[in-house]
Amino acid sequence: MFSDKDLRKLIVPLVIEQILAVLVGTADTVMVSYAGESAISGVSLVDMFAYMVITILTALATGGAVIVSQYLGNKEQENANRAAGQLMVGTLLASGVVCVICAALNSQILHLLYGSAEESVLQAAETYMFITAFSFPFLGIYNSSAALFRSMKKTNMTMYVSLLMNVINIAGNAIGIFVLKAGVAGVAVPTLLSRAVAGIVMTALAFNAKHEVYLKAKNVFCRNFEMLRRILKIAIPNAIENGLFALGRVLVTSIVAMFGTAQIAANGVAGSVDLIAIIVVSAMNLAVVTVVGQCVGANRYDEAEHYLKKMMKVSWIATAVLTVLVWLCLPMILSCFAVSEETYHYAYILVMLHNIFATVLHPTSFNLPN
């Protein structure tokens, strides 16, 4: 069902998209470090909580992508369009609720999770969380629209929009931190703007009737509880599974917050560098949904198993190679961050430990469940 050329055409843009995201994310953290360790600590605390929120929204997008891929595999285009419309409805409702809760209760949430952190860190975190909370609806519709394009194997579209989002983000951060000297707000506002632009552009593209699957107003604004139930049947278990994993990371970060600002900053720095080793496996997480979903929709279960094993093998090899490269370049990478010697030391240890376990466990923990 998928030739090697088809797989490369699907996966390579996803890998490039992940490379862009990791490079920009690391560059963001480097720039934030110049605003002080309180700033980078505050941002890292919120990013860890936001990771949990984004994981849940991504699970919803994945649920929709699975259903759409199955319909495409079974040549049911109209049902695929209906599923796409209901995916957007569910995404808007879920992300809207999350946005309101995070914006209204940001101080209470942060004090509950990270109350032992220094006051300067919490103030930075509150500012960052309040502003970026308004980006969740845009990020939600971006993820869902991008999932539709991946279902159609048009990953080049998501790559280009991701590039646009990342360029806006990194340029805005540079202006906010180095020109306007706006500190944490100088990082938060570009994040909001870049996600808003990406969400609007991606959704507008998804309404184009030239695509194999596209959004129709009648499918978005109607109530199709049966279709929504099918999406949620996949999305909810996925959200619980990945959400619990993300919650574990949040709880670990809340423990780290008790140790001091240097440790929080080191955790934030390590978190951005950690992503380098899992670039390929993260791209495979997205590709697996499309490949396996279409095979299952066409009742080709043997092929689904074959492709899954093939993609997991690539994930293991790529993660091992990237892990070695990160280890070799780690002193040079960490020297880019404007942090204390203590923070540098802790970050070094965290990256080393993460990459050891990621090489062994990441493909089975994420590729296989997808």
Language-model segment annotations:
Residues 2-30, 34-35, 51-63, 67, ...:
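N-terminal transmembrane alpha-helices
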Residues 21, 25-28, 32, 54-61, ...:
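Alpha-helical transmembrane segments and their lipid-water interface positions
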Residues 162-169, 272-273:
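Small-residue-enriched core segments of transmembrane alpha-helices in multipass membrane transport
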Residues 145-153, 173-182:
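Membrane-water interface regions at transmembrane-helix termini and the short interhelical loops
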Residues 23-41, 110-119, 175-182, 243-276, ...:
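Helix-terminus/linker motif at the lipid-water interface of multi-pass membrane proteins
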Residues 9-28, 131, 194-198, 202, ...:
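Transmembrane helical elements of multi-pass membrane transporters/channels
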Residues 40-100, 139-158, 253, 264-330, ...:
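Small-residue-rich hydrophobic transmembrane alpha-helices
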Residues 1-14, 68-135, 177-236, 292-357:
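Short alpha-helical transmembrane segments in multi-pass integral membrane proteins
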